């Protein structure tokens, strides 16, 4: 979650303190610049400023950085900055506004991995925000091409978590309402906005990828 000042600039200190708090309270990590973190509204310059300060956080190794932007070039540039600061795990939603199919989305992620080969990417499936809904076939193709890079998916469209089964791949529903069914089906946990307010009672174990406040 991003915390803003009265003038709508990013309050870096409070945002980092909040991220540390949810981890202290039991979450396995925190997503920086997810949808609840207002990823598409915060200027890239402010994101970079926060990332520079985030390097000093006591939980640096537990953050996943949301770098997905409508511009492929800006997405890659923000990832490069993040990598230079020691962050290696990213949450990336496909570009919004224009309509895309599986072919275009595979190309989008392929160009990212080809530009930054040493990274781990959690796909972000949220049709309501970006206009595209991942198919199982699309994800299977991406994992087949880049098994060391495409490590999981946050499923906020809920068309994947019941049926997507890939070895060494984490499926994380975006809501507590899907968590227990998801765990029964083999999901790894959740990435959820609710943890920002209730991190202590919704901490869960036996995960291959951390339960994350997003």
Regions found by a protein language model. Give the residues of each.
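Active-site beta->alpha loop and helix N-cap motifs at the rims of alpha/beta catalytic domains
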Residues: 3-4, 12-131
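Catalytic alpha/beta core domains of metabolic enzymes, predominantly
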Residues: 129-207
């Amino acid at each position: 979650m991003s915390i803003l000042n009265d003038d709508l600039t990013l309050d870096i200190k409070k945002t980092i303190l909040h991220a540390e708090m949810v981890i202290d309270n039991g979450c396995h990590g925190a997503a920086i610049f997810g949808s609840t973190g207002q990823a598409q509204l915060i200027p890239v310059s402010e994101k970079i400023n926060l990332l520079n300060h985030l390097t000093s956080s006591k939980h640096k190794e537990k953050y996943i950085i949301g770098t997905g932007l409508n511009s492929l070039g800006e997405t890659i540039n923000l990832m490069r900055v993040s990598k230079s600061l020691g962050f290696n795990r990213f949450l990336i939603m496909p570009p919004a506004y224009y309509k895309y199919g599986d072919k275009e989305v595979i190309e989008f992620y392929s160009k990212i991995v080809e530009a930054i080969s040493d990274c781990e990417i959690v796909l972000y499936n949220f049709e309501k925000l970006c206009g595209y809904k991942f198919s199982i076939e699309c994800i299977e193709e991406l994992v087949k091409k880049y098994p060391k890079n495409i490590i999981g998916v946050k499923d906020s469209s809920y068309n994947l978590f019941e049926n997507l089964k890939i070895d060494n791949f984490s499926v994380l529903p975006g809501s507590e309402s899907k968590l227990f069914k998801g765990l029964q089906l083999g999901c790894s946990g959740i990435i959820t906005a609710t943890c920002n307010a209730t991190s202590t009672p919704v901490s869960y174990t036996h995960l291959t990828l951390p339960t994350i406040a997003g």
